Amino acid sequence: ILGLVYLSQKEGVPKVISGASVTLQLLLQVVSGVIVFVMTLPFWGNAEAGTGLYGLLVLLPVGLIFLHPALVNRGLNLALRITGQPEMELSWRYSYLLGQLGLWGIFWLVNGVAHYFLIRSIYSSSLPPIPVLAGIFAIAWVAGFLSLVTPSGLGVMEGTLVFLLSFYFPVHVATVIALWSRFARTVGDLACATIAWGS
């Protein structure tokens, strides 16, 4: 977060605005990740884990409530006070936030498609449905982000992936998939950073 704020500041974006933008992005990313995971549970079919997690459907309305502009503004100003920044009132409409949430939902589904082909590149047997993979990788990212103890959720994200993927793959295969995903993400991040730095 601090890195994004710093780089935005170098481009002339006020620190308060960039901080609010990054905070909103992460909030939407977390809420959408949880919602996508919960909404894809019916695609688990007869998998043992899927039938035991239907109680998480209650998180759907909870996530939508947390995105109400009044609560978002309150949480944002709390974060600004903690960091010693002046408070601000952002006039976000609920429809705007829900639209952004929908776009993040599409992102997680595309992420599931990408991981389907990533797994297919190293594993030739049958794979879980794409919605299941989308939900697994979404909630694994959320778990890694919320851990706050390791950079980029290192270890926590992989552990979550291995646990959830092990309902469909042998544990050693799930472990390889988790590591392969981390490697691909790291290479992608470095490539994007190199391109941005060069421009």
How should these model regions be labeled?
Residues 23-32, 100-107:
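Select subsegments of transmembrane alpha-helices in polytopic membrane proteins
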Residues 1, 9-26, 170-180:
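Membrane-interface alpha-helices at helix entry/exit sites of multi-pass transporters
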Residues 5-6, 116-120, 163:
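Transmembrane alpha-helix boundary and packing residues in multipass membrane permease domains
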Residues 10-11, 121, 164, 168:
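Helix-to-coil boundary motifs at intracellular loop junctions of multi-pass secondary transporters
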